[in-house]
C-alpha cells in the first residue's frame, strides 16, 4: 500500500507513475488548497472541485482520501507552520491504522519549488522515521536559474530509482486532471506543457 502525502489538491499530477496501478492507495492532502486571504466562496469551489476530481479519476484506481488540511483549516503557503510533533503524531495515527508491513509513503521532495512541497517532505521524513517505513520523494518543479522566475519540471537534483510506466495512460490522466482543476488553470498554464513533455519523452526518476 502507498500513502501519498501531498500539500495541494493537484500535486498528484507529478506522481502519476506511482499512482496508475491497482495497488491500494491513501491520499492525505495537508492544506485546504487556498491562501489564507481566500474567502469562503473560493474555499468551497476549490474543495468541491478537488472532491469531484478525486471521485472521477482516482477512486477507480483503488484510492481513498483524507482532506486533512481542510479539516484542520491549514491554508496554502503556510504548511511550514504546522511542521511540529502534534501534526506528525496526528497524521501518524491515521496512517498507523493501515498495514505497515507493506506500506510506503510517497511525497514531494525538498527542492525549493514551493514551501508547501518542502514542508510535505519534512513531515513525510519524520513520519517515515516514526513509523519505520520507506519514504519515496518525487521532484515537482525545482528552480532553474536562481535569479529568474524559471523552473525545471520533474528533474530531481539527485536521481534515485527510475520507474517504468505507461506513457499513454499517464499522459491521458495528466490531461484529465489538469482539465478538472479549473481553479488552478493559471498555475498549470505555465507547468502543463513541461509536465506533458516530461512524461512523453523523459525517464521518470524518484528523488533522493
Task: Describe the function of each predicted region.
Residues 49-63, 75-82, 130-208:
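The feature marks non-catalytic terminal segments
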Residues 1-134:
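Active-site beta-strand->loop->alpha-helix modules in alpha/beta enzyme cores, enriched
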Amino acid at each position: 500500500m502507498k500513502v501519498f502525502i501531498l500539500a495541494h489538491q493537484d500535486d498528484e499530477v507529478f506522481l502519476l507513475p506511482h499512482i496508475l496501478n491497482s495497488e491500494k492507495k491513501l491520499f492525505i492532502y495537508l492544506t485546504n488548497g487556498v491562501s489564507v486571504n481566500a474567502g469562503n466562496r473560493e474555499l468551497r469551489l476549490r474543495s468541491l472541485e478537488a472532491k469531484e476530481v478525486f471521485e472521477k479519476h482516482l477512486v477507480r484506481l483503488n484510492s481513498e482520501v483524507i482532506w486533512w488540511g481542510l479539516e484542520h483549516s491549514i491554508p496554502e503557503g503556510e504548511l511550514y507552520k504546522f511542521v511540529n510533533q502534534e501534526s506528525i503524531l496526528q497524521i501518524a495515527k491515521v496512517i498507523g491504522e493501515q498495514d505497515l508491513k507493506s506500506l510506503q509513503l510517497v511525497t514531494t521532495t525538498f527542492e525549493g519549488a514551493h514551501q508547501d512541497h518542502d514542508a510535505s517532505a519534512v513531515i513525510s521524513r519524520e513520519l517515515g522515521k516514526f513509523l519505520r517505513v520507506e519514504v519515496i520523494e518525487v521532484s515537482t518543479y525545482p528552480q532553474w536559474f536562481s535569479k529568474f522566475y524559471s523552473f525545471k519540471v520533474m528533474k530531481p537534483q539527485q536521481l534515485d530509482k527510475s520507474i517504468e510506466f505507461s506513457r499513454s495512460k499517464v499522459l491521458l490522466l495528466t490531461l484529465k486532471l489538469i482539465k478538472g482543476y479549473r481553479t488552478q488553470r493559471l498555475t498549470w498554464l505555465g507547468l502543463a506543457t513541461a509536465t506533458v513533455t516530461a512524461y512523453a519523452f523523459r525517464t521518470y526518476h524518484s528523488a533522493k
